[in-house]
């Protein structure tokens, strides 16, 4: 059921395949971190669900071509908590909670919804946040063109230590600078 909601959401906000791409971007780094098969399986399960809370966001806000108002930004920032409310009651989905709730937390504490910082952010969410941002940057959106993978890797590197865990960002850039990345459409 959650997977169907996630796919419907991707169609609704014109990001088809986003969750699968995020999982594919994060998985090689998870292997390099020594995650076991169970943990990799949770990544594959949780990554496509990470934005499920966007079902609570109005479509016109998700597709807005210009800058968001403060009210619209507040609406967007509710999606991690809304997603947590969707997955928490479902026994089999609870382990996806770090991916859903914390993927917009920043290494320096400037993220949302809670403002966690550093290692207080679950490593699963820190890794997913990098993969999520990279896929967003390399995907065309109503409000901007897609960046090349090389330019997006430069952005990940530039945000290491502020938005992203510096060690994970370095590992992500090292991994994906030596492998071809198919940019999203």
Question: Where do the PLM segments sit?
Answer:
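Histidine- and acidic-residue-rich, metal-dependent catalytic cores
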Residues: 1-185
């Amino acid at each position: 059921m959650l997977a169907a909601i996630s796919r419907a959401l991707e169609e609704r906000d014109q990001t088809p395949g986003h969750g699968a791409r995020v999982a594919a971007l994060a998985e090689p780094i998870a292997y390099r971190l020594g995650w076991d098969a169970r943990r990799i399986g949770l990544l594959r399960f949780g990554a496509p669900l990470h934005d499920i809370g966007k079902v609570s966001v109005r479509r016109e806000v998700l597709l807005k071509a210009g800058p968001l108002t403060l009210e619209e930004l507040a609406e967007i920032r509710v999606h991690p908590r809304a997603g947590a409310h969707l997955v928490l009651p479902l026994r089999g989905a609870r382990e996806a909670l770090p991916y859903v709730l914390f993927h917009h937390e920043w290494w320096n504490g400037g993220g949302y919804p809670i403002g966690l910082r550093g290692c207080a952010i679950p490593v699963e969410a820190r890794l997913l946040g990098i993969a999520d941002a990279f896929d967003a940057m390399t995907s065309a959106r109503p409000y901007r063109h897609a960046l090349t993978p090389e330019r997006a890797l430069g952005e990940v590197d530039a945000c290491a230590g502020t938005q992203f865990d510096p060690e994970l960002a370095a590992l992500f850039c090292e991994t994906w600078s030596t492998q071809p990345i198919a940019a999203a459409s």
